[in-house]
Amino acid sequence: MKRAIAAAIALAAGIAGSAHAAAPAAKNIVIVPGAFIDASSWRVVHDTLRLKGFNVTVAQLPHTSLDDDIAIARKAIFQQFGNVIVVGNGIGGAVMSNVATGDKVKALVYVAALMPEVGETSQQLLSSMPGAGEGVKPDRAGFQFYDTARFHADLAADLTPNRVNFMAASQVPVSNVLMGTPSWFAMWHQKPTFGIVATQDRLVNPELQRWMYKRAGAKVTEIAASHAVQVSQPEAVAKVIEDAALSVL
């Protein structure tokens, strides 16, 4: 009887051990949104990746300063159990480039995003190859917002007006301090990097996107979309993120 019990315990332990060994690695994705188009724009990408088995976190950034945004992005990354893929859009690309995380981050995905080198500012990059849009406006509090009358044509021309009206009303301004702060770290030098060029982007010039991604040696995918590519082409964006994750996780 004792031998039978011992054998049963050993068998159960063996099964549990095998199950533990076969468990898949954690598949965590942290999204770092850009300015003007808020984090809710990533809803469909989030849902698509969740259905693929990924754990997805969308950080809510204040865009008050580079340090403020970095702190929130780092918190979101270090709250994950296991390795992480980080996705940045617009100014979110500059934020994630500066997040020093050691080995926890396994790859970076830039989605119509800024990709500064150490010492470069986001404003400097945008000014080097200006986009076709003309809607960025200053306010009296030291922030930049996007003119609601230009929002549809410049940021989301491939979306219906009713969707864009809400996006414009819920936009997140970006501080002049953030735009003018030099990057002190460029994580893309150390990590596998992927870039999405939104070929109809009027905020971040597609030629600037191509130039930054080429400089970084990124694997590039071009999508015919506006700057709001994550809203108009969510499946295509999710596919690039999924491929990046599966290549390193």
What name fits each language-model region?
Residues 195-197:
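Short beta-strand/loop motif that positions the catalytic acidic residue
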Residues 199-224, 244:
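Conserved loop-alpha-helix segment in the C-terminal half of the alpha/beta-hydrolase fold
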Residues 17-23:
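Sec/Tat signal peptide C-region and signal peptidase I cleavage site
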Residues 104-105, 109-148, 175-178, 182:
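Flexible "cap/lid" loop of the alpha/beta hydrolase fold
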Residues 221-249:
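Catalytic active-site module of serine/aspartate enzymes centered on a nucleophile-bearing elbow/loop
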